[in-house]
Regions:
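Intrinsically disordered, low-complexity segments enriched in small/polar residues
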Residues: 1-63
Length: 63
């Protein structure tokens, strides 16, 4: 199970806020959704047993 996670690297011209500013248990961002594009970002998770892992998913959006 994941205890906390961090989001970083969202495009600051499209997403507000563009990251979680450290480890959190919840995160919300607002997407302007004014560009048809695919955006990359990084998720870093801390598991309950202390292990860390990361993933680089993508968000695809557009008008």
């Amino acid at each position: 199970n994941v205890a906390s996670f961090a989001i970083s690297g969202l495009d600051p011209t499209e997403f507000t806020p563009s990251g979680s500013n450290g480890q959190v248990t919840t995160f919300t961002t607002t997407d302007k959704n004014d560009n048809s594009n695919t955006y990359s970002y990084t998720v870093t998770a801390v598991h309950e047993d202390g292990r860390t892992s990361s993933h680089d998913p993508k968000i695809e959006n557009g008008t």
